[in-house]
Amino acid sequence: MKYTATDKTAKEKTKSKNIKTRVKPGYHLSLGIVVTMLSVIVLIPLASVLVYSLKISPGDFVALIMKENVRNAFITSITSSFIAAIVNVVFGLIVAWTLVKYDFPGKWLLDGLIELPFALPTAVAGITLSKLYSGTGFFGKGLGKLGIDVAYTQAGIVVALVFVGIPFVIRAVQPVLEKMDNTYEEAAYMLGATPSKTFFKVILPELRPALLTGFGLAFARGIGEYGSVIYISGNSARHRTQVVSYVIMQKLSYIDYASATAIALVMLVISFLLLLFVNIVQVKQSQRTNLL
């Protein structure tokens, strides 16, 4: 029986695959640990939110979400998170660009300070921001003379969400800028393109997936933020400065777990759909970029 070159190649690939499988010991154990940890840390808690929220009938669920204070809290959280995410994308890109493209004294310190919102307790951030932007604060006093109130308004919520969300954008964009090939940028300059045209036509398309990722993470973080917001927002239903996380804490303080988990479920679905949309757009954008 004769063997063709194709048969020989197939046998070599099968042999190589078998060897590769054998040199990876502990596969089933590792997979079991990963699945168990994900289940305990992520899946079971998320499933419990769904289970508790099902204790409310569909009619009561809709009535709860449509209550004026709950509805306004969702509107405030979503709009504030969206505005803050847009601001974070703009300023996060500028900071990441500065850190990657330029050398200056204290660069290492600035790069390290970016991680501060991650490490700083959110309650401490909220107290600090509320003091700075209050009527007697360092920033609030000057803004007050211009007739601009930040503390205990929706603007204060946006400021807090910008503070906690900007590291997501910077850390998403910075590695892409560091690995970006400068050949296309230099070619654009040689062909007579202006710096602004080079940025928008050559550089920005490469950064778009990272910017979308940073936007999605900052937005999702903003919707669920609690500690840094409650101290600067005022938490007033009449002035529409309550956020969803504060309403959930109110329900929990009243031992109303079903209502709290129902509201949390809606917030969870919104965040999941947003991140899913961002990931889909990111994948399509990456595929389109690779085809160019």
Predicted regions and their residues:
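Transmembrane-helix boundary motif in ABC transporter permease subunits
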Residues: 18-22, 83-114, 127, 131, ...
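C-terminal transmembrane helix and the adjacent membrane-cytosol boundary/short C-terminal tail
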Residues: 2-3, 22-25, 29-33, 44, ...
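Transmembrane alpha-helices
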Residues: 32-36, 116, 163-165, 169-181, ...
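Membrane-interfacial helix termini and adjacent extracytoplasmic/periplasmic loops
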Residues: 20, 58-66, 71, 106-107, ...
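Interhelical loop and adjacent transmembrane-helix boundary motif
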Residues: 22-26, 61, 68, 226-279
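Hydrophobic alpha-helical transmembrane segments of multipass integral membrane proteins
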Residues: 40, 75, 79-91, 95, ...
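Membrane-cytosol interface at the C-terminal ends of specific transmembrane alpha-helices
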Residues: 148-189, 215, 276, 280
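Periplasmic/extracellular loop-to-transmembrane helix junction in inner-membrane transport proteins
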Residues: 20-24, 28, 49-86, 101-102, ...
